[in-house]
Regions:
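Conserved mixed alpha/beta catalytic, RNA-binding, or beta-rich assembly cores of soluble enzyme
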Residues: 2-44, 53-397
Length: 397
């Protein structure tokens, strides 16, 4: 009888991770114990993945509001700073904003509209249309914004982020001015010192600002890209990918993930004789069709993965084959024909009709989405995900 089960994704329960824990041992032991308890065999090319949160927690990669403030003060001189394009999030940005405000005399906060970079809306597109506002060209001050749109609350969180961010800045002792624009160069009419807080568009933003005459410009990826007073840091991403830990601190995106995943791969190989792929994952990069939010507030889906996860899928579209190449076949004859086609497929199907409709995403992004959806972001207690059969196809027995 042919095999009936394809890809399986399991969320594995793990201990609560604390700073200094040996995560390589914990992950390895969790996989081995789960295999025994649940009765599944370990195979070559299985995938084990860990949330970035437990990696950062084990590393103790944390920083305080005061650490952020000191770095901002050192880079901008403690004067006026234009803070542009932050995402609207209590978890992702509010604590960072407190640190930034404590390190400056005045904050000119420039928010993109109608939404932030990942789809959190201040207002709707319909409201822009109704008021005749052009988001590509119009720069609004706070008074004009309120006259046009009033006090809108986020539909999921119930927070008016304009009011919330304004209050945070004032609480930290800084003056605040708020404007709304989508061209980063608009901030230069208010200050030449700019901290751009966008994530995926940050390189373009920096280029535009540089060409327009910015005097001091750093990205959020350059704040806490080194340790301040013994704090955590991330040399590549700085504050990008950080989360609220407490009211006074953030957990930073993990660093040194490559040696970590390779150490787990080796330990599992020593224990099982199987070559298992290993990765660290953060946000899954999928988009909510209702809320329109893109689940990628992290700078990258996977900050570390083993070599076997490099690249993109190379797959045929079975529906296309069944409806076109083998439209006259059915039953076992159709099954045999499709299996034969899979076995003889080219090593690179890019641009070929038979691959049309397959997902052109990197393996780590696809698997990261699967892992994020499997582990969830709440109280499941499964920060380790074990995937089997991901690299199988219809011919695999």
């Amino acid at each position: 009888m042919s095999r009936m089960v394809g890809t399986v994704s399991r969320g594995l329960r793990a201990p609560i991770i604390r700073q200094g824990d040996n995560l390589v041992d914990i992950v390895t032991n969790t996989v081995l114990e789960a295999s025994k308890e649940d009765g599944f065999a370990i195979h070559d090319r299985d995938v084990v993945a860990m949330t970035e949160a437990i990696v950062a927690r084990a590393q103790g990669n944390y920083a305080t509001v005061d650490d952020i403030a000191e770095d901002v003060r050192a880079k901008f001189g403690g004067e006026t700073v234009g803070v542009i394009f932050p995402i609207l999030s209590r978890n992702r940005f509010a604590i960072c904003l407190r640190g930034i405000a404590k390190g400056a005399k005045k904050i000119v906060l420039m928010l993109s509209y109608p939404s932030d970079e990942v789809g959190n809306h201040l207002i709707s597109l319909d409201m822009l249309d109704e008021k005749g506002v052009n988001p590509y060209t119009d720069v609004l001050d706070l008074k004009t914004y309120r006259e046009l749109f009033g006090y809108e609350k986020h539909p999921f969180t119930g927070v008016d982020y304009v009011e919330y961010y304004e209050g945070l800045i004032k609480e930290c002792g800084a003056e605040v001015e708020i404007i709304f624009a989508n061209d980063p160069r608009a901030i230069l009419n208010y200050t030449k010192n700019v901290l751009n807080c966008d994530i995926h568009s940050r390189f373009r933003t920096k280029r535009l600002l540089k060409n327009a005459g910015v005097e001091i410009n750093y990205g959020l990826d350059e704040i806490l890209n080194h340790s301040v007073n013994g704090s955590g840091f991330n040399a590549e991403y700085g504050l990008l990918g950080s989360n609220k830990a407490t009211e006074e601190s953030v957990k930073l995106f993990p660093r040194d993930c490559q040696p970590f995943v390779e150490a787990i791969q080796k330990k599992l190989y020593d224990a099982t004789g199987k070559q298992i792929e290993v990765m660290v994952y953060g946000d899954g990069a999928f988009k909510d069709p209702v809320g329109k939010i893109w689940e990628l507030a992290d700078p990258i889906v996977s900050p570390g993965y083993t070599a076997g996860l490099e690249g993109t899928p190379n797959e045929l579209k079975l529906k296309y084959l069944a409806d076109n190449d083998f439209a006259s076949l059915s039953g076992d004859e159709l099954k045999a024909a499709i299996k034969g086609k899979i076995q003889e497929k080219d090593g690179n199907l890019v641009g070929q009709m038979i691959s049309e409709g397959t997902t052109p995403r990197r393996l780590t992004d696809l698997i990261g989405s699967l892992c994020d959806l499997t582990s969830g972001s709440g109280d499941k207690g499964t920060p380790i995900v074990y995937i089997q059969g991901y690299f199988d196809n219809y011919t695999t027995e």
